[in-house]
Amino acid sequence: MKDHKRNIAIFDTFKTRNKKFTGEAVRQRGIIAHLAIEQSPELRTRTSIAHAIAKKHGILWQNIYSGIFRDLDEVLIPSGVVKEGGRLPLRRGPKALQLEGVPFYELTETGLLVASSIEEIGDNRMKMLERYITSIPSVAQSDNIMREGILLLIRMAPSFASKIISEYIYAYSTGLIDKITPLDSKKLQSVISKQIMMERELIEAIIGLQPDQKELVRSFFKVIS
């Protein structure tokens, strides 16, 4: 299902350094996190994004500007995660540039869902996920069950909800699925059914337990976690 678009790299890690994100992954995660949180258009230009990410990592913004430019123009925009939100007028510089203005960026619907899988955003990512899931139309009964189920997990088991969405976004980032939005039950099932077999087995087992057995399981997890 892959096409000519370059896949987003937000989960890419070095093969020789376990779980350490590549420079491209760090930049793209930084761009998405910045656009998810920052409201001012003036602070969502390429230069402002470069400044924000550079400050966080203690480096010069000039050293990552070209990477930011490339990530936006060659990856995040073509993949449908980011779009140009408009242009800001310039009072100085070349006349042509003043007339054209400087672009600022924003997350698309797909981008909001991708952002909910990025830990750097903190608690806001669950709020973003909840906002997106709430907006899903109930066309089919299975989609309604999916929507209400994820909303319940966000409130009661946010870590599990996060795992489900992260696995889904990971499949998108590796090109296993071409589009992640709109989210529907069939598409979600095709990606995560094998990834949550352990949780499903546990939940189905607990449902069938007697009250004293449920209490034992609860105590067991308290002891080992």
Q: Could you tell me what each predicted segment is?
A:
Residues I8-T16, K55, I64-S66, R92:
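N-terminal pre-domain segments used for targeting or regulation
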Residues G80-Q98:
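Beta-hairpin "wing" of winged helix-turn-helix
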Residues G23, I59-G86:
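Short amphipathic alpha-helical interaction segments
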Residues M1-R44:
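Short alpha-helical segments that sit at the start of domains
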Residues Y65-D73, P94, I154-S162:
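Compact, well-ordered interaction domains used in eukaryotic information-processing assemblies
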Residues A96-Y132:
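Short, amphipathic alpha-helical interaction segments positioned at domain boundaries
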Residues N124-K222:
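Exposed, interaction-prone assembly regions rather than primary DNA-binding/catalytic cores
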Residues P41-Q62:
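Short acidic, hydrophobic short linear motifs in intrinsically disordered regions
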